[in-house]
Amino acid sequence: MYKRQRQFPASAIKHKDGRLFEDRDGIAWVNPYNREYWNYVLGIAEEMARSGVNEIQFDYIRFPDTNKPLLMSAEEKRARVEVIHEFLKEAYKRLKPHGVYVSADVFGLVPNTAGDLYIGQHWESLSSVIDYISPMMYPSHYSKGFASIKDPDMNPYDTIYHSARGAVNRSQKMTQPATIRPWIQGFTATWLRSHIKYGQTELQAQIDALASLGVDEYLIWNPGNRYENLLKQESNVSIDVADSASN
């Protein structure tokens, strides 16, 4: 739940001393407690739903990931998990009459974390109020040693398997969970010292890991929207290509 807020500082997250908070990318964040902004976002979503799209997917549906003390509103004693849950619940209520699916992206670590990572993303709280939940399970984004994997980016099958297994296990315990539809890696993480080039073999390894757990839906992300090298050869597995410029 972010937006450049320099022109509207009253609705932005601030430091405890009153200064405008900006994340590491220099982006100011809207206050997630701000119901006026909820209506703004959901109004746009409703307009899109009326235009004929069949799904509304919410990205950055969270608080900023920072360890700095922040000032958000007089309501900030309410749990962050509760705020994100209520927003998505309201989104579902307003969008379902238009016949669209409602989905949300979450950090890849969320299904393997008991809490909310201090950003308001808790697996069961989100999965219970939407149609699809998409953990961003890019192997390059996991720290060395995740699930005892020395270099996650160099082990796409194992990384996706252990990450998705947490999601499947938790959803199986729920009465009515959202369908799990992860984001998987369609790019090469050249910034990592220990990385491999991602092509069709690495893509298929991720898909196979999901399939072994019964997860047959997924989205592929490439930050430059370059999917040609991944799709040169025909595959027996259908591939959903997302034109998402950022996750």
Describe the residue ranges of each PLM region:
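Substrate-binding cleft of secreted/luminal carbohydrate-active enzymes
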Residues: 130-141, 153-247
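Active-site-adjacent "subsite" loops/lids of carbohydrate-active enzymes
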Residues: 3-50, 204
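Aromatic-lined carbohydrate-recognition surfaces of secreted/lumenal glycan-active proteins
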Residues: 3-4, 57-58, 79-120, 160, ...
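The substrate-binding groove and active-site-proximal loops of carbohydrate-active enzymes
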Residues: 25-39, 74-82, 148-156, 193-194
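Active-site-proximal loop/short-helix segments
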Residues: 6-14, 51-81
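Short, acidic/polar
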Residues: 35-49, 114-126, 195-211
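Alpha/beta enzyme core
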Residues: 42-58, 62-64, 132, 141
